[in-house]
């Protein structure tokens, strides 16, 4: 197989099925680790469609991610899960299509870092807002009549949770997977990818991509602890005491880890 044979429909179908299967299996491993709100899972398996997007292009990655997330959500719930159909499927499709569109056969480390941030942010915003404003309002009666400000806060909280728990895995693990693919099957990898792997990952850009979200999370944690934001969360139906405490811990722990990683990569320059 070479890089041009990926365009063949049969090969593209096989790659799409592989992406969907691996993504579903990887996602199921953490399917029961929820967000602070009890729905929306911790999902480091996003490294799988990110890898497929870079190596095989936007279509196999986007379709594979959409099918994979629908499969794992449906297995978890025991039926075709409407929340996945309404929110997770379009969000995963759009996010990984963007990553593949901008990186496939146009790869550089700088683009990879930038587009990974953008793709994950777009995907998580789409999933969070569709899940809250479409699925929750349409299918769960307790959300009917909830104020828009509360729903927006919930969607933004989900977006933040997903983004900060996915980004480090994509930026740190995906390059290793790409390197393994290039070393194992160099004939079907595009020349620009092989060339890019011969260059050093830009530590300053990788550092900024980690340090920026890390500092933001630490600031949010401090605001929750020491300002009226914490009281607002306690009295907000979208949060409550348990969610507030989990978010507080999450902000400090993830913020410290991301900041430490960012500073580490800066020191390696």
Predicted regions and their residues:
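Loop-helix junctions at membrane interfaces
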Residues: 1-269
């Amino acid at each position: 197989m070479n890089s041009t044979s990926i365009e063949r429909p049969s090969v593209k179908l096989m790659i799409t099925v592989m992406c969907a299967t691996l993504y579903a299996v990887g996602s199921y491993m953490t399917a029961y680790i929820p967000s602070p709100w009890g729905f929306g899972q911790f999902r480091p398996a996003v490294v799988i469609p990110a890898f497929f997007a870079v190596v095989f292009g936007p279509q196999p990655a986007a379709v594979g991610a959409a099918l994979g997330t629908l499969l794992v959500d449906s297995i978890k719930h025991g039926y075709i899960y409407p929340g996945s159909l309404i929110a997770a499927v379009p969000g995963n499709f759009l996010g990984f299509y963007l990553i593949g569109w901008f990186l496939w056969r146009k790869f550089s480390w700088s683009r990879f870092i930038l587009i990974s941030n953008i793709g994950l942010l777009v995907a998580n915003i789409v999933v969070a807002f569709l899940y809250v404003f479409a699925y929750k309002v349409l299918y769960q009666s307790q959300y009917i009549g909830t104020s828009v400000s509360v729903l927006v806060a919930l969607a933004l909280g989900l977006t933040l949770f997903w983004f900060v728990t996915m980004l480090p895995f994509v930026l740190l693990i995906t390059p290793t997977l790409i390197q393994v693919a290039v070393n194992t099957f160099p004939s079907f990898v595009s020349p620009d990818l092989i060339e890019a792997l011969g260059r050093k990952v830009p530590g300053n850009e990788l550092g900024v991509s980690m340090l920026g979200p890390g500092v933001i999370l630490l600031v949010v944690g401090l605001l929750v602890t020491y300002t009226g934001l914490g009281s607002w969360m306690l009295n907000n139906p979208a949060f409550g005491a348990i969610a507030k405490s989990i978010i507080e811990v999450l902000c400090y722990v993830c913020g410290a880890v991301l900041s430490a990683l960012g500073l580490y990569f800066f020191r390696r320059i």
